[in-house]
Amino acid sequence: MTQPIVVAALYKFVTLEDYVALREPLLQAMVDNGIKGTLLIAEEGINGTVSGSREGIDGLMAWLKTDPRMVDIDHKESYCDDQPFYRTKVKLKKEIVTLGVEGVDPNKKVGTYVEPQDWNALISDPEVLLIDTRNDYEVSIGTFEGAIDPKTTSFREFPDYIKANFDPAKHKKVAMFCTGGIRCEKASSYMLSEGFDEVYHLKGGILKYLEEVPQEETKWQGDCFVFDNRVTVRHDLSEGDYDQCHACRTPVSVEDRASEHYVAGISCPHCWDKLPEKTRRSAIDRQKQIELAKARNMPHPIGFNYKQTPSEA
């Protein structure tokens, strides 16, 4: 029986002054262990989602933990039958998750971590303001009961949203969450810098919550968007039924795919009447390349305008 592919989402905010020099040995460790996916490294830490065999993931994690700064690196695992990534990359970045606000550093100031088993009690408190820090297309397919959707299209928009809608003098308790924990951790550092006093964030993110909290006790509704070919996972972390429109990145449901406006790789009901002609032509060309690669049984990066984006985890 074929062993499932292990998908590991990992990150750690830690000062890596030598991050440029780390790139090549880290890339070699990924190659040596047969790992696919992308890792981002910056002076503020490391972030990414990778996949491989059980032995490969264990080998990579063991290599990372030989560095004393990485001994307690956070990672979550799920499984799938097919390789969700096609390439092996290590990228140098200014930020491992891009907020775009100078001086925000979770290594120096961060909110209160909340374990998954304590999350339900916290968000049941009527005085707690619950904010989903993810992008609008992620929120559309699943979120926590009672969560506020900022309707942002990128994490860079989050600071302006907070400034326009919330006041530290009025909103005393704030709880935030994201896919794997990294965005809400950085958001908590930003919120504290803006004067918010009680700031909480879900440790390990939604993925850790789904892993540890039984479905009969859950306050999660829907699927969870993930940044790989699986597109979404269910509460049991199995692959969901969504695909992703390669033109606009929006998750598309079974119902969406039945629409006359859905053309695989080219358009969906969410974008068919909004796509610029140049984008549409590029999507058509990319889809032809994908189909040709499939016919030749060769891997090909997923469609137009889609990027593996571990920085959004």
Swiss-Prot record:
<dbReference type="InterPro" id="IPR020936">
    <property type="entry name" value="TrhO"/>
</dbReference>
<dbReference type="InterPro" id="IPR036873">
    <property type="entry name" value="Rhodanese-like_dom_sf"/>
</dbReference>
<feature type="domain" description="Rhodanese">
    <location>
        <begin position="124"/>
        <end position="218"/>
    </location>
</feature>
<comment type="similarity">
    <text>Belongs to the TrhO family.</text>
</comment>
<dbReference type="InterPro" id="IPR001763">
    <property type="entry name" value="Rhodanese-like_dom"/>
</dbReference>
<feature type="active site" description="Cysteine persulfide intermediate">
    <location>
        <position position="178"/>
    </location>
</feature>
<protein>
    <recommendedName>
        <fullName>tRNA uridine(34) hydroxylase</fullName>
        <ecNumber>1.14.-.-</ecNumber>
    </recommendedName>
</protein>
<dbReference type="Pfam" id="PF17773">
    <property type="entry name" value="UPF0176_N"/>
</dbReference>
<dbReference type="InterPro" id="IPR040503">
    <property type="entry name" value="TRHO_N"/>
</dbReference>
<keyword id="KW-0560">Oxidoreductase</keyword>
<dbReference type="GO" id="GO:0006400">
    <property type="term" value="P:tRNA modification"/>
</dbReference>
<comment type="function">
    <text>Catalyzes oxygen-dependent 5-hydroxyuridine (ho5U) modification at position 34 in tRNAs.</text>
</comment>
<dbReference type="Pfam" id="PF00581">
    <property type="entry name" value="Rhodanese"/>
</dbReference>
<dbReference type="GO" id="GO:0016705">
    <property type="term" value="F:oxidoreductase activity, acting on paired donors, with incorporation or reduction of molecular oxygen"/>
</dbReference>
<keyword id="KW-0819">tRNA processing</keyword>
